[in-house]
Amino acid sequence: GEVKSPGLTQLKAGPLNAIRSGEYWLRGTVRTGPLSGEVLLASYSPTLTQQEFVGNHYQWHHQPETDGDAAFKNTSTQQFTGRLSQRLPGFADHLFEASASAVNLLNYVYYDQNGLPAQLTSSKQLLIGFARHRVRFGRFGFDNQATYTKGAENNSEALRIPALVTESRAYYQSYIFGKAMFTQVGLEFYYQSRFRGYDYSPSTQQFYLKDNFTIRNYGVASAFFVADIKAVTVFLKVPYLNQGLNGAGYFASPYYPAYPRRFQFGI
C-alpha cells in the first residue's frame, strides 16, 4: 500500500484530526494470480483558482479566511477497483485486461452553468468499466481498449463525460538497416459517444457546464510512423484522416471546433 498525508508535525499532534481536516492519499492493493483489488481513499483541497479569483468579468472568494462567499470544503474520494490481467492461450501473444471501479465523490467542486465555482452538497457515484486486449502476430500488432462510465450522463449535475470511449491501434514494427533503426507504422482510431460538453471561459480559462449544446458522437482515424535511432526518436502523424467522410469536422467543446486534418512532426 501507499500513504501520502499531511506533514509529520500535524500527524503527531493529532493523526485522526489531520486526516479529517487535511489532505491525504491512501491506497491499498491485494493480488492473487491474475486478479487484484485496490482501495483508494483521498482528500484534497480545491485549487487556488476555485477558491479565489478577481477579474474583469468574474470574481469570487471561497477561502476560509476571507469575508465573501462560503468557503469550500475538501473534496474526498473513495474508489474500489477490481482488476483482471490474463495472458490468453493461442498461437499469438494475447494479453487481456479488465477492471471495474465504484467511485464515491463528496464535496466535488465544479464550474456551474454561469461559469462560477460551486460545490456539490450531496455525494456523487460513478461506475467505471474498462477492457483492453493486446495481441501480436509476429511483427503485426493490435491494441484495442474501451471505457464505459455510468453516473456522468448529459443531465448529471457537476460532472459530465462521454459514456463510451474507445481506442484502437493496428501497427507493423520491425528493425531496418541492420537493426540500426526500430520502426513502427500503423493506424489508430478514437471514438467517443455524444454528451453535453463543457463550454470554455477565456476570462477565467476554465471549462464550465453547458446545457444547450450536445457534442455528437464522432470517430477520428489517424496514421502514424515512429522511428527510434539509438537515443533519438522521430515521430510523424496525420490525425483525422477521415475528415470529410462523415462531416467536415467536429466540436471539441461547444462552439470550439477541433483541429482539422494536419501533419505533425516531432523529435
Residue positions per predicted region:
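Exposed, low-structure sequence patches enriched in small/polar residues
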Residues: 1-267
